[in-house]
Structures are given as C-alpha cells and as structure tokens.
C-alpha cells in the first residue's frame, strides 16, 4: 500500500470525495482515505502522478509520503498536532472581535449598556460598525470560505460549504438591510429604519464562524489525543547508537546503523536495533513492546528488540534488523495501516456523507421558500434556512468510526496486541469459535520433566543421574528435557560408552561397566522385570498426556521419568474466559486421541480434534467455519494456511515470521490470555462505534427538523447561533466518546458479555455428515472406481472412500440425502447394498 498526505480536507464529505476521485483512476484497485490522519492509502498499479492529479482535480492537495519508510515511521512530527495552535490563535482573535460586535449589536438593547455618544440615533454608523467587525471576523476565518466555495466550485460541497453559505447568507442579507436602512434614513422614514435594523444578522454571521471555530478547536485537540498511542511508540525509537568499529566506540545517528554492525548498550540505555547478544547478561525491560512489566533476563545468544531498555548489565550485540525492519517499526506500521484502512461498518457513514451536504443545501433552500410562502418575512425565512445549514454536521458521521479504530488499535498496541487492519479490529469481536493449535499456543512448546518415579530402593538422584548420563548422548527432544532437568538439580553425569540409539525402541550404553537401557515399555520389559504396579503408573501417566520413559540398569528397573509438553500457566484461565464470553474453544493437535484429550481436559477446552496433520489444519478450519465465525490461534509455519483461511488469524508473538505474516492480529507476548483480551477490546471498540454512529445519525435526524422550524407550533425553535453551537459540539462529543476507550481495561473479565451460540461439535457434525454403505459384489480396484464415481456424481456427496477388501463405501456429505438415493446409485452399477449406517 502506497501512502499519501492529503491536504484541504475538513469533513467526511471531503474524504468521500477524494476516495471516489482516486478510485476512478485506471490501475487503482483500492483506496482508503483517513480524515483523522489526513492520509490516503492506495493499492494498484497507477502512477503517483495520476493519483495526485486526481486528488487535485477534486479540489484538494496531495503528496507522496517521502523518505524511507523507516524515517517516516520513526518521525513523530508526522503526527504532531499543528492544527490546534492555529485554531487557538484564530479563536482568540475571533472571540475578541465578537465580544465588541455583541456589545454594539445587543448590549444596549438587552442589558442597557451605554454606547459612545457618536452612536446615539446614528443608526447608519451602528450598522457600518457591525459590518466592519463582521468582515474582520470573516477575514480571520477565511479558511471556511476558501475551502467551502472551492469545494462548491468543484461540485463537491463539504461542511465548510455549509458554514460559508450560512454565514454569507446572513452577512449579505444584513448588508442589504443596511443599505435599505440608509435609504430609509435619507428619506426620514424612521419606522422603516427601525424595521431594517431588526433585520441585522451581522452577529449571527460572526457568531456562526466563531462557534464553529470553538468546535473545530476542541475537535482538533481531541483528535490529537487519539494518536497519542502511536506518537508514544514513535518516541520510543532511539535517536543514536554506540557502535564498535575497528575497535573504537562511535556514537552515530540511528539511521546509519547497518545490519551486522556491533553495537553496545550500557545500563539504562535503550537498545537501538533488533539484535542478538554476543557478550554480556542483563535484565531487559520489554514493556514498551509487549506490555509485560517484569524485565526479562537475557544472556549471550538471546535476541533483543529496538526500543527496549537495558536495566542492568553491559551488552554487546550484533544488529540483525535495522530501520524499517525492526520490531518497533513493524508495530508502528501495523498501527498506522490499521488507522489508514476502513472498517466495514464505516461504509454506511461513507455513503451518507457522500450525499449529505448537497441534501442539506436543498433542504435549507426548501425551508426558506416554504416559510416565505407561508407569509413570513425574508429575514425570518432566511434565519430558518441558515439554521438548517449550520446545524447539519457530516463530520460527526465521518469521525464516528476512524477515531474509535485509532484509539482501539493504539490501546491494543500498548498492551502487545496488534490489529493489522480496521476490519480485523471490528471482526475479532464477532468470533464464535476459537481454534487453538496445541504446541506453542496452549502448551509451552518444549518438553519438560513432570514426574520422577524411582523403583524399589533406587533414589530420585540415582535415577536422574543414570538417565541423564545416557540421554546426554541423544539428540531427541525428550532427551533434552531430561538433561535440562538434571542440570537444574546440579547432577554430574557419568561417562557412557558403547552408546546406541535404537529407533522405535530407545537407547542403550555402558556406564561404569554396567549395561544401561532407556525406552518405552515394550523395549524395557525385554531388559528388566516390570511389576503390575509400575505398569499401572505408566498407564496413568499416559492417560494424563505424559510420555513415560523407562530406565533399567543390568536387568533391574531403575524407575520412570515422565516428560510432557506442559501447559502454559495462563492457558486454563484464558480458555475459561473465552468460554465465559460464549465462545466455543477447540484444540487442534497431531497427538493421539488419548494424549490430546488429557491435555484438552487440563486446559478446559470444549472440544479436541486429535490426529490432525499440519496439512489437515486447513480442512479442520473449513469444517469449523460451517458452524460459525472462526478465529485460529497459532505460532508455527504449518499454522500459516489455517491462519489465512480462518475468519480471523491470531499469531502468537514468539512464532515464526510466516505465521505472523499470515495473521490478521499479532499477539506480541506469547500469552494465550491476550486472545480474550483482543476479543474484549474489539467488542468495546465496536460498541463505541455503534454509540458514535447512533449519536451522529440521531443528532442530524433530530437537529435538522428543529432548525427548519417543524416544531415551531410546539414552541420549539432554533436560531442560527444555537445551531452553530450544536454543530460545533457534535464532532467534539463523538471524538470524546472514542477517547473513553483509553480507560477500558482489556484484562478485566468481570464485565464480559456472554453470547449464546448453540454450536455443535465439529466432530459430531462430521459424524452426522458421514455415512457408511456396506456393499456386496466388489472384487477389485475397478469395482471400487465404479462405485466411487457413481456416488461422487450425486450433488449431495462431497467425497467417497471405497474399499473392496472391507466391502464398504464411506461417504462424506455436503447436504442431507435419502438412503434410497445412495442405494440406487450403487445398485445401478450392479452391486448389492446390504446396509447403510
């Protein structure tokens, strides 16, 4: 996606106009414009020149975001709030001159404030003073007129057009009244003079501009806060690094650091690039990236990330990712891209915004004409029309979704949860089923010793010493678990000679002149006597999802060491939270059914799908999708296809780059508890968007009829000044409501809302969609092929597995089918159907 800066946009109608114009450029496949960040993301083959030209023809300015992506991402000045200071300055002078104008126009009438003697009975001077003060305020706020009339000229009216038309109408009519009053005074018609003076709307013309500026200032300030999370991430990027070159330490700008450079980090300093530690040990604070407050111990060989803080020791590292490739830059890019994309829910507001302003102008004209036809004066009718113009606010509609998306994605980034697009932030909250890969997601992904059971007089240390001595020669993952545990207990291993690895059985060797063996039950019972009690223990361990390793020395059983891929500490709690949210939790694993069920029971999942090969995960997700919206959580290369095909793919942060690229949501910390937190945040963001859209639609639906005077018979009316005040506050209310998301607690499960799904198990569903046909008469492979073809030609049949050896055809169905139809298809090929199950 190519990013562009867009200038001149003031409301949702502007962004809709730009998006429409660029989407028509040949070669553009998608275009998304963000009013919040004044940016545009374009995909396709169209040239920069063609895209920029289309934006300019629409009446706006555009430029490609220059420089390297790394520099662009690292420079927080791109998001600095430059609009608020300008608006504050405009507001200061506008309010100053408005106070003087209000003093002359209303002070003497409403509060009896004295006027300079020069103005006594000098109505023309009074009118001219009001005109001049209004002109000054209009010049101060000329941006409304330049933008508004320019957009009108390009046949793309926006919010500024409504303000400009409303203020201009009030000013022009007041100027006309001033000329007519001057003529009446020249003729000595004082009654006409007083009548025309009452038709002055100079203060309304000025008040509209000032109040809209108040609203714009509040809105700009609030919008600036929505990007605080992104700006705080950008500020984390170190500005310099200390590198080691030719034996000398040099402090260099961060953008000059190259891959494979050696850099040094002292205690208290930020790590400048992603790298691997060559020398040194330290505790590194990774809270900025993962949200984890406890520093992580690091030593030689461990990886470190840019913007994390070295808390204790001295580190010497080699850079492996620099500039735009660092973890920090990738996080910033993901958050920026999420803000640049549009959530599906925003399409409604976009469609309305595109026709909103022209519709309001038409309503204002009709309103004015109707009041004139009802016999009211021009001033009264014009006031109703102006009220319609200035109360209508497309900005509230346009901001309803993007501000919530920006705040939500920023809050997620602060907590180590990265949503790649606005759509993923919206859809995550609608998930009904969560499929969890077992290894590395529910479990820690590395086998560990869970039980040590010595036999007879053998002690734990004796068993562990013998086991570690033999396993030290093995490369098997289970062997590493035993060795690691022995090292943690400071066990000193003996030397082993004549070592042999016996595939499918175990290990053998000689230690201190004695024969030692390790392996499964079938192997060890040929080397030593196994009591029924030991067999029962092994059976129980297997039932708990653990692998029992037997060890024997010179014909005597030493004992059992159980090894298992242990469940992460937070997995059961995370699964429980998901279930409490009304989400069905399914575990996918390649383990056998017995082991898988044991782990699934410990984790607390609803359903276990065992024996799933890496290539079969994709098929399992397809079946789950028939039951509801599915999220897949995984961390490995073999999870990538399943992550892609799921409605939402969530990659655990410690996983591979392939898995992270395939996912819609990245969990920076390898915590399963971040899955319910991500769903919780998505639901809160979606709820906030609904609130914003409701307010925006409700405000305009109620406000426009009131301004038009529909409720005047009930005594409810609205003058242009109150209309402008309401308009100025509408966008501010929407943005402020979105900022409330910053107070949301992602990990607070006490307010989780349970959604009733009533979903079947996929295993139950699969059984319901399978039938086994018992057939007589099949003799060879040709018979199998004939029956298979006959069955698969039926539209309700997805696939058929036929065996002449067992005399069966196992049929997988797409839809319900009568047994008689299946029977006829087989018997038409001259075979006999005995039964169908």
What are the residue ranges of the model-derived segments?
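Flexible metal-binding regulatory segments at protein termini and peripheral loops
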Residues: 1-125, 248-251, 333-341, 745-837
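Juxtamembrane coupling segments of multi-pass membrane pumps/enzymes
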Residues: 2, 181, 190-192, 206-267, ...
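Conserved ATP-binding TGD loop and adjacent catalytic N/P-domain core of P-type ATPases
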Residues: 16, 29, 267, 321, ...
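Conserved cytosolic catalytic loops of P-type ATPases
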Residues: 26-43, 48-49, 53, 200, ...
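Transmembrane helix-loop-helix hairpins at the membrane interface
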Residues: 86-240, 351, 720
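Membrane-embedded alpha-helical bundles of multi-pass transporters
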Residues: 110-124, 153, 172, 411, ...
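Conserved catalytic phosphorylation-site environment of P-type ATPases
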Residues: 289, 348, 383, 396-470, ...
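P-type ATPase nucleotide-binding
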Residues: 449, 453-581, 593, 605-621
């Amino acid at each position: 996606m190519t990013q562009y800066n867009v200038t001149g946009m003031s409301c949702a109608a502007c962004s809709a106009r730009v998006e429409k114009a660029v989407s028509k450029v040949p070669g553009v496949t998608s275009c998304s414009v963000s009013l919040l960040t004044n940016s545009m993301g374009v995909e396709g083959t169209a040239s920069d020149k063609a895209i920029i030209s289309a934006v300019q023809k629409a009446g706006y300015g555009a430029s490609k975001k220059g420089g390297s992506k790394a520099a662009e991402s690292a420079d927080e000045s791109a998001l600095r709030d430059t609009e608020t200071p300008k608006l504050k300055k405009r507001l200061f002078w506008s309010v100053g001159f408005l106070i003087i104008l209000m003093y002359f126009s209303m002070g003497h009438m409403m509060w009896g404030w004295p006027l300079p003697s020069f103005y006594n009975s000098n109505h023309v001077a009074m009118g001219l003073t009001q005109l001049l003060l209004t002109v000054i305020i209009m010049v101060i706020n000329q941006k409304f007129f330049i933008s508004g009339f320019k957009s009108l000229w390009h046949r793309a009216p926006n919010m500024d057009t409504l303000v400009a038309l409303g203020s201009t109408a009030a000013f022009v009519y007041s100027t006309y009244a001033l000329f007519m009053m001057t003529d009446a005074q020249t003729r000595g018609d004082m009654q006409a003079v007083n009548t025309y003076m009452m038709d002055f709307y100079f203060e309304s013309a000025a008040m509209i501009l000032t109040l809209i500026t108040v609203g714009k200032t509040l809105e700009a300030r609030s919008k600036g806060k929505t990007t605080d999370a992104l700006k705080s991430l950008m500020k984390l990027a170190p500005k310099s690094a200390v590198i080691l070159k030719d034996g000398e330490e040099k402090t260099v700008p961060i953008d000059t650091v190259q891959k494979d450079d050696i850099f040094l980090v002292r205690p208290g300093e930020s790590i400048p690039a992603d790298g691997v530690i060559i020398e040194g040990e330290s505790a590194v604070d990774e809270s900025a990236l993962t949200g984890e407050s406890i520093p992580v111990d690091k030593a030689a060989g461990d990886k470190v990330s840019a913007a994390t803080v070295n808390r204790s020791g001295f580190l010497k590292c080699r850079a492996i990712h620099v500039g735009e490739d660092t973890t920090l830059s990738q996080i910033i890019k993901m958050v920026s891209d999420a803000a640049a994309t549009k959530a599906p829910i925003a399409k409604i507001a976009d469609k309305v915004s595109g026709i909103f302003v022209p519709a309001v102008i038409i309503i204002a004209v009709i309103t004015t004409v109707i009041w004139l036809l009802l016999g009211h004066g021009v001033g009264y009718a014009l006031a109703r029309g102006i009220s319609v113009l200035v109360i209508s606010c497309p900005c509230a509609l346009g901001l309803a979704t993007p501000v919530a998306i920006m705040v939500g994605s920023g809050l997620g980034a602060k907590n180590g949860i990265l949503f790649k697009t606005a759509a993923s932030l919206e859809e995550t909250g609608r998930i009904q089923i969560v499929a969890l890969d077992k290894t590395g997601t529910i479990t820690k992904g590395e086998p560990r010793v869970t039980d040590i059971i010595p036999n007879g007089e053998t002690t734990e240390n004796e068993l562990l010493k013998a086991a570690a001595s033999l396993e030290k020669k093995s490369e098997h993952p289970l062997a590493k678990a035993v060795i690691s545990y022995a090292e943690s207990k400071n066990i000193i291993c003996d030397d082993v000679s004549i070592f042999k690895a016996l595939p499918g059985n175990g290990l053998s060797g000689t230690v201190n002149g004695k024969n030692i063996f390790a392996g499964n039950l079938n192997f060890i019972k040929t080397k030593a006597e196994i009591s029924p009690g030991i067999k029962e223990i092994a059976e129980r361990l297997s039932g708990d999802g653990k692998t029992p390793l037997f060890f024997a020395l010179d014909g005597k059983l030493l004992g059992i060491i159980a090894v298992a891929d242990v469940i992460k500490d937070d997995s059961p709690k995370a699964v429980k939270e998901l279930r409490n949210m009304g989400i069905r939790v399914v575990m996918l694993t390649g383990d056998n059914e017995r082991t898988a069920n044991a782990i699934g029971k410990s984790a607390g999942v609803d359903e276990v799908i065992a024996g799933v090969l890496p290539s079969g995960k994709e098929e399992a997700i397809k079946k789950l999708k028939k039951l509801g919206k599915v999220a897949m959580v995984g961390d490995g290369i073999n999870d990538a296809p399943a992550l892609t095909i799921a409605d939402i793919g969530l990659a655990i942060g410690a996983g591979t780059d392939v898995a992270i690229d395939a996912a819609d949501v990245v969990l920076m910390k390898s915590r399963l508890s971040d899955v319910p937190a991500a769903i919780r945040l998505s639901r809160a963001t979606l709820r906030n968007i609904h609130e914003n859209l409701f307010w925006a639609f409700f405000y305009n639906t109620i406000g426009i009829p009131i301004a038009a005077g529909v409720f005047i018979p009930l005594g409810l009316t609205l003058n242009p000044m109150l209309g402008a005040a309401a308009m100025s506050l509408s966008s501010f209310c929407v943005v402020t409501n979105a900022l409330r998301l910053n107070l949301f607690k992602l990990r607070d499960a006490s307010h989780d809302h349970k959604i009733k799904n009533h979903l079947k198990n996929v295993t139950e569903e699969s059984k319901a969609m399978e039938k086994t046909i018992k057939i007589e008469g099949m003799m060879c492979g040709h018979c199998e092929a004939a029956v298979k073809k006959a069955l698969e030609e039926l539209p309700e049949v997805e696939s058929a597995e036929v065996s002449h050896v067992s005399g069966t055809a196992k049929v997988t169905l797409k839809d319900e089918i009568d047994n008689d139809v299946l029977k006829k298809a087989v018997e038409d090929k001259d075979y006999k159907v005995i039964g169908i199950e």
